[in-house]
């Protein structure tokens, strides 16, 4: 939702259009969700997702399908999202933390130091590939949102877990290759360049909160807030959809 909070600035080397600030002075409003053509996906074609979250997502879809004009399983093509994201993230880590690590060894946490070590192996060829692939994924998303108004996924790959557990080491018996992988359903959509928002959608397994992730095209931040607000209002009073 960043484009809903920033102004244009000539100091930005890669300027982009932003929302009018007057839009932010207005409270979210109810819209007719029956006009929305919606795509849904368990995993965007690449993200790990537990069976429990898939099954819960199915149950929620059965309850909300009639809120929309149409609902179809679909997502933008992004088979190389993992590699693209990790490479671009690595470049950012080198820029943000390498000087600190060099000047003050031991001042950074082990996770950041490990990321810097991995990033040090990135080549110019890797960077070129990642930038090219990011452009492909971004354009795939733009074309996708010409057909659909909204993309909905589960908000997380696993139910809430204990605070003492650093991150899920495995999902349904499949080992996660790193500490980020379980968050793929969230970091994948950052490659679209558009807004995403998570709203509560009842409970999972009758116990903990369950959320759905709403994603839309670039520069549709204000509209997405209206969609999220409208769905939250529709969920009220429904024990299967309202957070209890």
Model-derived segments and spans:
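Small-aliphatic-rich amphipathic alpha-helix that forms the alpha element of a beta-alpha
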Residues: 142-143, 176-199
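Short helix-loop capping/hinge segments that flank enzyme active sites or metal/cofactor-binding pockets
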Residues: 27-41, 88-142, 154, 158, ...
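A short helix-breaking turn/cap at a secondary-structure junction
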Residues: 1-55, 234-244
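Short amphipathic alpha-helices in soluble, non-transmembrane regions
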Residues: 227-231
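Short glycine-rich, flexible loops that bind phosphorylated cofactors or substrates
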Residues: 47, 159-160
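Short, well-ordered beta-strand elements
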Residues: 208-217, 224-225
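Acyltransferase
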Residues: 51-75, 97-103, 127, 131-148
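Short, surface-exposed loop/helix-turn segments at secondary-structure junctions
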Residues: 129, 161-182
């Amino acid at each position: 939702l960043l484009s809903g909070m920033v102004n244009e600035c000539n100091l930005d080397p890669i300027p982009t259009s932003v929302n009018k600030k007057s839009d932010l002075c207005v409270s979210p409003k109810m819209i007719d969700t029956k006009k929305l053509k919606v795509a849904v996906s368990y995993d965007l074609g690449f993200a790990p997702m537990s069976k429990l979250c898939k099954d819960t997502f199915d149950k929620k879809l059965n309850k909300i399908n009639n809120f929309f004009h149409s609902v179809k399983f679909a997502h933008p093509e992004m088979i190389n999202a993992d590699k693209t994201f990790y490479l671009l993230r690595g470049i950012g880590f080198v820029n943000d933390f390498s000087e600190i690590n060099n000047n003050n060894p031991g001042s950074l946490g082990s996770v950041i130091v490990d990321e810097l070590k991995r990033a040090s192996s990135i080549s110019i060829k890797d960077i070129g590939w990642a930038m090219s692939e990011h452009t492909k994924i971004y354009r795939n998303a733009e074309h996708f949102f010409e057909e659909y108004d909204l993309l909905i996924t589960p908000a997380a790959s696993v139910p809430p877990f204990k605070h003492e557990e650093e991150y899920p080491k495995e999902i349904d018996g499949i080992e996660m290759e790193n500490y980020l992988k379980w968050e793929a359903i969230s970091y994948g959509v950052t490659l679209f360049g558009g807004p995403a928002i998570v709203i509560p959608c009842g409970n999972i397994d009758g116990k903990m909160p369950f959320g759905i992730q709403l994603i839309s095209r670039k520069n549709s931040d204000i509209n997405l807030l209206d969609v999220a607000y409208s769905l939250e209002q529709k969920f009220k009073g429904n024990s299967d959809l309202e957070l209890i």
